[in-house]
Amino acid sequence: MSQSPIAADDAALRSDVRRLGDLLGQTLVRQEGPELLALVEEVRKAVREGSGAEILAQLSVEDSVQLVRAFSTYFHLANVAEQVHRARVLAEARVTGGSWLARAVDRIDAALKAQTPGHELTKEEIAEWVGAMSVRPVFTAHPTEAARRSVLNKLGSIADLLDDPRNPSQQERLAETVDLLWQTDELRLGRPEPLDEALNALYYLDDLFTQTVPEVLNDFAKEMKRIDVEVPITARPLSFGNWIGGDRDGNPNITAEVTTDAMELQVSHAIRVTIAAMNALRQMLSVSTKIVGATPELSASVEKDLKHIPEFEQRFLRLNAEEPYRLKATAIVNRLAFTRDRHATGAPHVPNRDYANTAELLADLVLMRDSLLAHRGELIATGLLERTIRTIAAFGINHATMDVREHSDAHHNVLKQITGIDGYIEKSHDEKFEILTKFLADDVRFDASQLEALGKKTVDTFVAINNLIDRFGPEAIETYIVSMTKGADDLIAAVVIAQQAGLVSLKEKKARIGFAPLLETVAELRAAGEILEKLLSNAAYRSIVALRGDVQEVMLGYSDSNKDAGIATSQWEIHRAQRSLRDVAMKYGVKLCLFHGRGGSVGRGGGPTYEALIALPWGSVDGQIKMTEQGEVISDKYALASLARENVELTLAASLEATILNRGPRQSKEELAAWGDCMQLVSDSSFKRYRALIQQPDLPAYFYSSTPVEQLGELFLGSRPSRRPDAAGGLDSLRAIPWVFGWTQSRQIVPGWFGVGSGLKAAREAGHSALLEQMLKEWHFFTTFISNVEMTLAKTDLALAKRYVETLVPAELHHFLDEIQAEFDLTVSEILTLTGKTSLLGDQEILARTLQVRDAYLSPIHLLQVNLLKRVRDAGDSADPVLRRALLLTINGVAAGLRNTG
């Protein structure tokens, strides 16, 4: 297995892949005998020559398992080599072309000097935006990375070894790890519990704290200083969020107890890494008062610490008597340990002995910094100490801020019971809004003691949030997200229940959390401005927003709108929703924080992060932005420290640019109107074609028969079920993730492109060819949209899809593939006409070739999957467990080859 599946013109990369392939071949011979390696090569050759299906059909189940494991393992190894290569290339690019942040600040500096009319800038404005900036990637569990943590750990070890060429034992250690990888089961034995998922996220957060964020925030401050803008030492331009343990929408496994347990786990990790950081500071800060002084404030603070911490080790008092910074660092370590113990036992906070919140910890650290700055210690203060302060400001003593999400129906179910209002559920959105806002304004409390189980579970969540904020501070949980928000009343319903739990009270001028509507379907997106207008024009709710610092968060869902309307309409309606939300927020003097619920695949809003952020409507990134980092992409983005740094830095840089350089329209009103009209035509025609496909009564039967989606649940990818609870069968009950998953596995990838060709054709035939070309060159939104569609088309393989259909789908349903093929051909033709290329990715030859060669290795797995799916279905309930295992392994293999699940 020595041929590289990577076509990049880079000797080091090709060498690494060849080397890992050779090691895998040796492992196969060592572990299973030469017959397996011979079979791998025979199948690879046969597939290339078009006769692979015949050979695969004759394989035993056991041989099928071994074969798919071999190909899947090869993809895992190739992916690692690619990651290491990307890290090398990025390191070189940083040296030759500067970092993402450096380039962003260069563009801001150029804008400062240019002072273009209508886009004038001042350093004071920039300083204000930077001081209030908040960029927050939010980790979610679903869709879960298909590979187990045990597999990812082995792959991480291989990456470390590849990155250490001077290690004399490198070859032996690589061989050892590949053997370990082969002997590790790729499949989970059971569905992960929510706390298992939380631990997985904490694995990455720990590494970000220790390896990535200190350097990124240090660089951010340095780059801004280059244009005379100071980033306040305790500013929080970057922080992290977490849904794991808080997202209960459709996941019955998330209870108030699970949320509490997840937060406790998170905080324990945060304190552990913070103590380690303080120990590093303690070791370094050997500054002696025999040589330089210390401020009276620092000395008094140390004295107070010694008074309140009688357990302070005498050894440190003796050895560090003239080293106040070490004494202060030791006191901080002690207070952090007491904080950890307080959380573990539930004991009350003791002032000056443990920390009530992050602000108290930062105050101690700033005291040390100020003292150093006052006593010839500027380089020391702005070195490790400043990096530590900025990092702790980013993570806090909670590591990440947890969001809580629940479906809007859950809140109305509670209110129906506790208010006793006849026909409450049947009332209109406006009627409910009027009733509920009066309850809010009057601070009405209800008796919730007689609630049924589901209602009690919902109320218990709000009680738990209140308790967690009491225990862990205001940064523990900041936002409650209401999914399926169809009207303003859906959000207010959650606020009224929060009022019952003591989280909100207008009489007490208290709002301990904020509330965010999640707009997911096309109808909700189109109503976005109207919903926000109704909320902000209401005095009671506007008071809540004022109590939250005049910031209103709105979450946009990319997945459901795509499943509902197709990619063109989904992307366009999300773009339009952002414009209307921006305008309403500006009207009411509110800072808008948009939370982008983007997935890993293009069909769920995925794509290059930098381009996506730059393509957002002007003024919609007002220094505040959140975006999901979904389970399937976290490993690819954060597994290596260098790649984690790249991802965090480009996200911060793009958000900085979008905030400062995209505050007003770049085009005239007439131009924007013409583009909008043209895009509306593309969207309408695309929507019509997409709906014509998915509304056909037999489409669900085609989808389920031509894809392995029904096996998704057996992979135990996450704690959340793949279907919505209490929903009927068919496509409506299917979540967007398995919808994309199924189409992707069978290489039809309908959610990523279907309908776009019809939309572009309609615009072209309406005489808009020149306008489309202008949009492609000058409109970031349209450029990014077309680029993402082109990438998905390149990954689509309808010749392989035909194998699925001919083998697995009843003949009377084959016409669906004909429809998909026709739209595919049209979309490719329209994209090539628009871009002027002769082939997909024609301007990215290396990437195109990489995908082409990967397909040569993916094809055997696909053909095996088709064969195994047929055998499993033919066997029905009596299917051999080994046969089912072989099938599940093919699903993992395709996910590894395509680098996403759904």
Label every model-predicted segment.
Residues 679-686, 690-723:
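Active-site phosphate/pyrophosphate-binding segments
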Residues 1-436, 454, 513, 606, ...:
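Often metal-dependent polyanion-binding catalytic scaffolds in large enzymes
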Residues 25, 578-588, 749, 825-831:
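Hydrophobic cores of alpha-helical transmembrane segments in multi-pass integral membrane proteins
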Residues 254-286, 501-688:
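Catalytic or ion-translocation cores adjacent to nucleophile or general acid/base/metal-coordination motifs
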Residues 704-713, 717-902:
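C-terminal accessory/interaction regions of large nucleic acid-associated machines
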Residues 4-7, 187-206, 256, 264, ...:
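Glycine- and acidic
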Residues 342, 397-492, 496, 500-506, ...:
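Active-site cores of enzymes that catalyze phosphoryl transfer or operate on phosphate-rich substrates
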Residues 42, 81-83, 103, 107-108, ...:
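Carbohydrate-active enzymes and regulators
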